[in-house]
């Protein structure tokens, strides 16, 4: 997890650990915000769609995603990451759901990255410089799966 952020889930009024959630340890030499921003990029999403089962985001996949040190140290990515995470928080919705099948009440936060696309695009534009993408490659990344990602649910 980035910056020791933890998902908070209440089940029947009791705080519970989310079993599927795994922690990502980041070396102190790296900036947590920039790593979080890069993992929130469309570039990372495209790689996730292209190279995984599209269901399980594994620690191994994250560990093997190539991130240039220059991108981790880029102040623009750090600033865009801070703006992105603040926007995620501003747009989140807390849900309180009763599951009849289990008889349990669950409270959780839902996040809507499509509402923060301007920040994600800015991160991808900066990343394109670090990965030496052409304009066409950057355009492909920014617009990848756009209809699905930005459409109404």
Short names for language-model regions:
Residues 1-153:
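S-adenosyl-L-methionine
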């Amino acid at each position: 997890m980035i910056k020791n952020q933890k998902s908070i889930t209440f089940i029947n009024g009791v705080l519970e650990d989310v079993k599927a959630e795994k922690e990502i340890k980041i070396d102190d030499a790296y900036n947590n915000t920039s790593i979080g921003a890069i993992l929130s990029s469309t570039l990372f999403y495209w790689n996730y769609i292209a190279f995984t089962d599209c269901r399980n985001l594994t620690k191994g996949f994250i560990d093997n995603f190539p991130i240039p040190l220059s991108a981790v140290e880029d102040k623009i990515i750090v600033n865009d990451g801070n703006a992105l995470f603040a926007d995620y928080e501003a747009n989140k919705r807390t849900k309180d759901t009763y599951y009849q099948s289990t008889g349990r009440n669950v409270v959780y936060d839902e996040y809507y990255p499509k509402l923060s696309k301007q920040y994600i695009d800015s991160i991808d534009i900066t990343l394109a410089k670090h990965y030496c993408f052409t304009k066409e490659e950057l355009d492909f990344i920014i617009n990848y799966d756009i209809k699905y990602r930005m459409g109404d649910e």
